[in-house]
UniProtKB/Swiss-Prot annotation:
Residues 8-17 have a biased composition (Basic residues). It holds the Pfam family PNRC. Transmembrane segments: none annotated. It comes from Schizosaccharomyces pombe (strain 972 / ATCC 24843) (Fission yeast). It comes from the Eukaryota. Residues 68-77 have a biased composition (Basic and acidic residues). GO terms for molecular function: mRNA phosphatase activator activity. One of its GO terms (cellular component) is RNA decapping complex. Residues 85-103 have a biased composition (Polar residues). This is Uncharacterized protein C18G6.09c. One of its GO terms (biological process) is mRNA methylguanosine-cap decapping. Residues 1-26, 45-106 are annotated as: Disordered.
Length: 312
């Protein structure tokens, strides 16, 4: 009776193995769980361990293929049977060969027909632990690398809240005109040619509210052309042009004329009285100081950093 069961089982095994891919196990038959570190079958039968699960270690406790003096590719006969009548090697075979040599140490051979219930893997466990530690370490390294690279980029593009706090500020050649005191007047050269040039009045009178700190602090005294300048006292405005003729009954005004003082041709209609409360008094001129340069350079570097980082 036991011999018949064994022979019938061998005959069924040969039929299964003769089919193309009959003894191979699909990945859907095996359930992988990282928590339990085990491989659980979903249905009974001859379950084979897939190739991507098998570690490269020899089976230490009972290697049937090597004990019989046969290689892995040889067919193993069902001569050795356990007490229950099942052959001890029938738990795992791959298409006519013994796969017990590929199992890790510590795995007991399963009875026939039941498949492998549970594989307690020591080496796969350690391998998975090393993989998880490598993943965590690599992710941490990536995080540290990204933070370091971003801080390096910030330090290269923009160093400190202002330019003077930068360690490289002392190494830069500062122009000599920055050392001039604020109260000193700029040298103004009169234009070559006659004063009665073809420059309209409203072109000279274009002005705006001073925005830089030095212009606010110095007022209009620093500007080379202001109505306090004695060189401009004799200039008379007639028909939208400057003329050098001195007439005591005309006054020079530096205020911006309003639109109702212009005729159809765009020229002023007459003398314009200065409005003292106007914020546009005085001819506008750009006075560049060290504070202005640092302010604009700091603002430019902030914009450049925002553009590089994509936050603008």
């Amino acid at each position: 009776m036991q011999k018949d069961i064994g022979r019938r089982f061998q005959r069924n095994k040969k039929k299964i193995n003769s089919k193309p891919g009959g003894a191979m196990v699909a990945s859907s038959d095996v359930e992988f769980s990282l928590d339990g570190m085990s491989i659980m079958p979903q249905r009974d039968g001859n379950l084979q361990i897939p190739n991507f699960v098998k570690p490269k270690s020899t089976f230490a406790t009972s290697n049937i293929g090597e004990s019989n003096g046969k290689r892995n590719g040889d067919k193993v006969r069902g001569n050795r049977r356990s007490k229950s009548g099942h052959s001890s090697y029938a738990g795992s075979r791959i298409s006519g060969g013994n796969s017990n040599s590929h199992l890790p140490s510590g795995v007991a051979s399963a009875p026939a027909g039941l498949g492998i219930d549970k594989v307690a893997v020591g080496e796969v466990d350690s391998h998975l632990k090393s993989v998880s530690s490598y993943v965590s370490n690599s992710s941490g390294a990536d995080r540290s690398f990204s933070s370091n690279s971003s801080s390096d980029t910030n330090s290269i593009l923009y160093a400190g809240p202002t330019f003077t706090h930068s360690p490289a500020a002392s190494n830069l050649p500062i122009p000599t005109f920055l050392h001039s005191p604020v109260s000193e007047k700029a040298e103004w050269q009169p234009p070559t040619g006659s004063v009665n040039s073809n420059m309209p009045f409203q072109f000279h009178q274009s002005s705006s509210v001073p925005s830089t700190p030095s212009e606010v602090a110095m007022g209009h005294n620093f500007c080379p052309m202001s109505r306090n300048d004695p060189s401009l006292q004799s200039i008379q405005q007639t028909n939208g042009f400057y003329s050098g003729h001195n007439s005591p009954h005309t006054n020079y005004s530096a205020s911006t004329p309003s639109f109702n003082h212009f005729n159809a041709a765009g020229h002023p209609t007459g003398n314009i009285t200065p409005t003292l409360n106007s914020p546009n008094n005085g001819i506008h001129c750009h006075s560049t100081s060290a504070l202005d340069l640092l302010f604009h350079r700091d603002r430019e570097q902030r914009l450049f950093r925002m553009l590089r980082q994509g936050s603008a």
